[in-house]
């Protein structure tokens, strides 16, 4: 199985602009990418970062084993096109033209990803296995069908169900809070701090930036220490 | 295993007040409760609704087998106290004083609950198994320890981890998007319509009320047909 991790290498995570400077957003996005790559390698696979611009894995905070297992492919086309160019086609991977090598696509902002959660996805038996995020996004999927193609525009989880149906592919929805939580908006930062482990880079970055959990009566939010806020 | 489903029988789901009338909120909350009870029975258990006021299961839209398997216990105390009164104590369930019967607590607003997702929770081996929701809530848990007690006030998932640690109970976090999605706010209604099945009552109610998925370019939202809006 190939595991592709799409990554917006320039101006990532603009929806966090209210709480993070551009430099912080870049550092945070790279920390999440490093956590995702680590989880993929721990799950026994060699991830390919599908980056919109050149990226040197040496500049990420990665264990040597993860860095060595990873590679980068640059493709500046929109996400859907770049991913589709990586999906299996009939004849890939086997001389007889029938076997194809499945391709997994795991978004780089799944900061809560763990090897266990990824293994549950990677071991799904269907032609297409999808992990939906909130709002019918597609946070991760595995494609083991030569005709299935992605369409990340709009309600992609619903689209992917339809596309699978249209090409005669079986589809399984994989139930995971960890993989179903993509980190896009300020409210999502709570999840990084609540569920991240001590060795994860993304929560460490947030703490460096001065974020901490604020436990009020009704719920948990993140707060940024006054003196650490961007001026 | 006992399965307890806490249910606010009066004025439920006030955070949906912007989009649903009080009567609609009551009907929707009861539809979600019926879906949760059905999933519990499909998972092989007999649910007890822990209601804040008297509730007649005959008035819920339930299959006969589910209605027959269910029961109601009324407890008008705050959630934490009412649940703690139901948790196992040392000596429960066995003559020798060592065996206890585990108790599961599944919230009534987990509209996406399925038998599969519940079975994954119910089969957890730890003394305490917790399904967190967004914002560090506790959406469901199974307690198989005589000293563990819940505290739903505030960041309950974090509190429950601490409480388990303090009483020497092992804790497992169960990873489920379906059980991790509680339906509290208008934005959550999208998930009911995206992930509900054809036989589920909660999405059927929303459609009766005039809600439908609105698939714009960027994301999916729910929209309510103009003529169906409360005046």
UniProtKB/Swiss-Prot annotation, chains A, B:
Enzyme class: transferase
Protein's UniProt name: 2-phospho-L-lactate guanylyltransferase
GO biological process: F420-0 metabolic process
Sequence similarity: Belongs to the CofC family.
Reactions catalysed: (2S)-2-phospholactate + GTP + H(+) = (2S)-lactyl-2-diphospho-5'-guanosine + diphosphate
Pathway: Cofactor biosynthesis; coenzyme F420 biosynthesis
Keyword Disulfide bond: no
Gene (name only): cofC
Nucleotide-binding in keyword set: yes
Role: Guanylyltransferase that catalyzes the activation of (2S)-2-phospholactate (2-PL) as (2S)-lactyl-2-diphospho-5'-guanosine, via the condensation of 2-PL with GTP. It is involved in the biosynthesis of coenzyme F420, a hydride carrier cofactor.
Source species: Haloterrigena turkmenica (strain ATCC 51198 / DSM 5511 / JCM 9101 / NCIMB 13204 / VKM B-1734 / 4k)
Assigned EC number: 2.7.7.68
Description of how the protein assembles with itself and partners: Homodimer.
Pfam families found in the cross-reference section: CofC
